[in-house]
Amino acid sequence: MGCSWRKTLSFFLVFVPIYLHGASSQEAAPVGPRKPFFERLRRLEEQFRRFQEVTWTHLQNIASNYNVSYNVDVRFRSLAEESQAVAQAVNRSQASVQGELAQLKAWVRKLQRRGRKVDTRLRALDLTLGERSQQRARERKAHKAQRDALQDSLARLEGLVHSQGARLAALEGRLPVAHPGTAALGPALVPTPTQPEELGPTSLKLQRDRQELRAASEHRGPPQDSSAPLQGRREPPASGSHRVLSGTAPKDPRQQAWSPQVPGEICGVGPTLVFPNASTRNVVFLSPGFVTALRALSFCSWVRTASGRLGTLLSYATEDNDNKLVLHGRDSLLPGSIHFVIGDPAFRELPLQLLLDGQWHHICVIWTSTQGRYWLHVDRRLVATGSRFREGYEIPPGGSLVLGQEQDSVGGGFDSSEAFVGSMSGLAIWDRALVPGEVANLAIGKEFPTGAILTLANAALAGGFVQGANCTCLERCP
């Protein structure tokens, strides 16, 4: 822009003198006609004015263009400065980013090293845990095998113990007839030193039972008829007969003084419940029931029925099943038969025709989830047994446990055709399987097995016509 303006100004300065020189030379020419000359001069003046105007306009355009170019240059310089500042800022930020990246790379390298160490430790832990889990699995398998073997051995041992107990009971029933005196009982039951025998766990238990039977025979009076009911000979309590349920089973049987009673009497067995008729109002609750799950059960009681059939002795119901544990008989069943139910609909039919004679009898129903074995003892004698009945089952806690009625709902739904009519005494429940020696001692009133979880001391009358009494002897109960 500056160069073009300078060229135009130079051209104007050169052209004006030349033009003025030409005009002066024309004036010095010979005088001719004056009009054409003035006209030409006016035209030249007009041309000059137009030229001046054009030149002025052109100069103004040049000046304006110069100003614009100057402003553009200023802007370009400012932009260049700004771009330079931006470049410097970018350089500074790039430097800081590079520094941060270097720090991050250092941290990443540290984390990678730590990660490799952690991976190494994790692999070592995995190997250790794998070895331990395998070892624990092997130990669990070994423990399971040992437990199964122990359960099998225990089941076989229980079967042997109960069979030996039944044989001992049968022998005891025959011995008074075969040997009138008590002096012959010792050699007949206990092996002499000249007859050594290998004493395993079963033999030791058998020998103890024989010694107990021998000791019991020393207190027996003249031999009685073997067909008579078995008598309990417990020392009668000091108080007389009264209609309350405050009596309990002996807390510590070793502190009780046992002495023979009159033959034919059953004494000192504890509280007695009398169910006079088949009313559905005749019900007794055992509280608090089962507080823990049961994998074994023993139910023992003295029972006397007043009708030609057996009703419900025991009923345990929960919210999901009203027949978790039942000992009941209906008037439609075979007289003297009773259904032993664990976890409806599984049941076994037990023969109890011996109880229909209107006399007192001692019964024990025993069950264990190990191989599902069960036993029924009546007056110390094993009358029924079996296996594979609810094997591995657990009787759940938290239900309603009643005597004398069969529950179709928790605590209700009674039916008079299933009601018990008669008397119960000395009732007790254990959370384990009693052995034959304990059953025999309980039946003869020699010793009360330890660990009972429920007795008639836990009974609560729910109205109706049920009567409670503490009788010195069962034969004197109403």
From Swiss-Prot:
Species annotation: Homo sapiens (Human)
Disulfide bonds: C300-C364
Glycosylated residues (UniProt): N67, N91
Alphabetized GO MF terms: metal ion binding
Keyword Calcium part of the UniProt annotation: yes
InterPro entries found in the cross-reference section: ConA-like_dom_sf, Neuronal_Pentraxin_Related, Pentraxin-related
Residue ranges of domain Pentraxin (PTX) in the record: 269-473
Source taxon at top rank: Eukaryota
Description of what induces expression: Not induced by bacterial lipopolysaccharideS (LPS) or IL1/interleukin-1 in endothelium, monocytes or neutrophils. Not induced by PHA in lymphocytes.
Tissue: Widely expressed at low levels with highest levels in small intestine, testis and brain. Very low expression in endothelial cells, monocytes, neutrophils and lymphocytes. Isoform 1 is not expressed in small intestine.
Underlying gene: PTX4
Cofactor note text: Binds 2 calcium ions per subunit.
Signal peptide positions on this chain: 1-25
Keywords from the named record: Calcium, Disulfide bond, Glycoprotein, Metal-binding, Secreted, Signal
Protein name per Swiss-Prot or TrEMBL: Pentraxin-4
Location within or outside the cell: Secreted
Region: Disordered, residue numbers: 208-262
Entry binding sites for Ca(2+) 1: D322, N323, E406, Q407, D408
GO cellular component: extracellular region
SMART domains assigned: PTX
Binding, Ca(2+) 2: E406, D408
Family matches, as CDD domains: PTX
Keyword presence, Metal-binding: yes
Cofactor needs: Ca(2+)
Compositionally skewed regions (Basic and acidic residues) per UniProt: 208-222
